[in-house]
């Protein structure tokens, strides 16, 4: 695939309460030996994305330990590699990531130094299976600047947990709001 991958794994979720007191949500155990980030990593590997950056922040120690061996996903350095980035305090930047857009912004040099023409951004705390090749094919066919994978939220009271989209009849995004208190729309971004 002609894309580089970024997995956002730095957030905390107050709904997880005690479960996230000592570990990042992306490091939460799933079915025994797996962690929630393994699903995004497997999706990247199965889509033949060979260069992946994981952006960590909150309670990242156990996540970093889990990621220290990339052999499970075959992100060898010769083909690309698995990179783990934490917020870095510099003269220009004295803050932790101030959200997902800022996490991407603070790591723009990684993207600028890459040769892949496309970027796949995924969440590290979602459990799903997705072929990013199909998403990229759709993206190219639509000649889109950005493609957001979305679904309908069955419970309108739950939209406050997601990014909410309003799209036109051509499936072009006309409005996007991250975690609104209330929304008349129920199309939400996933991953």
Model-derived regions, located:
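Unchanged
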Residues: 1-191
């Amino acid at each position: 695939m002609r894309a580089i991958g970024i997995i956002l794994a730095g957030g905390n979720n107050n709904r997880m309460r005690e479960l996230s007191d000592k570990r990042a949500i992306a490091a939460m155990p799933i079915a025994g030996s797996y962690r929630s980030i393994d699903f995004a990593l497997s999706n990247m590997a199965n889509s033949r994305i060979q260069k992946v950056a994981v952006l960590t922040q909150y309670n990242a120690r156990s996540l970093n330990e889990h990621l220290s061996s990339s052999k499970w996903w075959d992100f060898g350095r010769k083909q690309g590699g698995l990179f783990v980035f934490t917020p870095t305090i510099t003269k220009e930047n004295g803050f932790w990531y101030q959200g997902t857009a800022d996490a991407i912004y603070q790591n723009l040099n990684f993207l600028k130094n890459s040769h892949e023409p496309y970027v796949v951004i995924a969440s590290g705390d979602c459990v799903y299976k997705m072929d990013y090749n199909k998403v990229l094919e759709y993206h190219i066919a639509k000649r889109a600047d950005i493609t957001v994978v979305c679904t309908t939220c069955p419970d309108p009271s739950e939209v406050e947990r997601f990014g909410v989209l309003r799209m036109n009849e051509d499936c072009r995004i006309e409005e996007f709001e991250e975690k609104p208190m209330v929304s008349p729309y129920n199309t939400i971004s996933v991953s």
